[in-house]
Amino acid sequence: MEVCGFNELKLVGASCATIYIDMKHSSNDNLTYDIIIIGAGIIGLATARTLLIQHPNLKLLILEKESDIALHQTGRNSGVIHSGIYYKPKSLKALTCLEGYQLLLDYVKEKNIPYELCGKLIVATETKELDSLKTLYHKGIEHGLTEIKLITGEEAKQMEPNLTCLQAIWVPYTGIVNYKEVCKRFLLDIVSMGGQIKC
């Protein structure tokens, strides 16, 4: 079986953080890595980068089945930087979203990766949606998004002339970024810290 350029990949021994691999075409029959990460999308690359920052002596390998990084979901999405407004306040998902949001903004600023905090409008177009919109607004405030605003349909139309709604939440935290560019920078960081990738 061919896996990302390997003629054969066998797990010949594994412990909690060590995996031994046997590659038939390798001059070294027993390459050893502390960590092997499968997949070079944003999650695989971010995980690898974080591990190498926290444990600089790790021998780390990323295996990617494609010819390049970020060719699937990571490179084929709308690039939204999420605020976490829809998550249950104080839940693990909400807290990690807030933490990840700030880490991402800090990173793109540090690396001069283009991004835009363009904001978004969450709208109620029917009377029956107004209560849900207000509930979401209060959840957003509880979540720590103190700059969100509950605005009228007319105020929303001033922001977006093609929009017709009764009421809206303005979420200035939401942004966009090219996650493929973020991944390219992650990979440069990983390689500079001694990590390896095999595509």
Q: Residue spans of the language-model regions?
A:
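Glycine-rich FAD pyrophosphate-binding loop
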Residues: I53-Q73
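N-terminal amphipathic/hydrophobic targeting modules at extreme N-termini
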Residues: F6-N7, L11-V12, A17
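A short, basic/flexible loop-to-alpha-helix module at the beginning of a structural domain
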Residues: Y20-T32
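Helical element adjacent to the flavin cofactor pocket in flavoenzyme catalytic cores
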Residues: P172-C199
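Beta1/beta-strand and adjacent pyrophosphate-binding region of the FAD-binding site
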Residues: N30-G41
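N-terminal Rossmann-fold NAD(P) dinucleotide-binding loop
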Residues: G44
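Dinucleotide-binding Rossmann-like beta1-alpha1 core, especially the glycine-rich loop
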Residues: G79-E155, M159, C165
